[in-house]
Amino acid sequence: MDNEIKLFEGNQIRSAWDSEREEWYFSIVDIVAVLTGSNNPRDYWYRVKKRMTEEEKSELSTFCRQLKLKAPDGKMRETDAADMQGIFRIIQSIPSPKAEPFKMWLAEVGKERLDEIIDPELTIDRAFIKSAGV
């Protein structure tokens, strides 16, 4: 998996591209932080997860995975992550005025990767820009 940092309104969202499944996975805690503005997004996610399991009878294992993503301290740590479908389910459980702009941002992230699959030259350009620090 290729780990990347994506930016939504200046906030970092840790992500990973699974080339076998050809889909993005995003750190759920990062998304919760962006949507809620919570000082403790890990605890907020714990409560949402508990509510989803109890009230909605959701099997989180069907759309949540533990992935090693780079933590703020620079170390690779396991964190809950979900693909786009899972993220949309989670967004529905979090009341936030940022939900709609975030959904549009997710769609753009997905479109960028599809464009790169269709035109591999875009991947090379993106890697060049990234290595040049632009």
Each predicted region: which residue ranges?
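An anion-engaging/catalytic patch
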Residues: 1-134
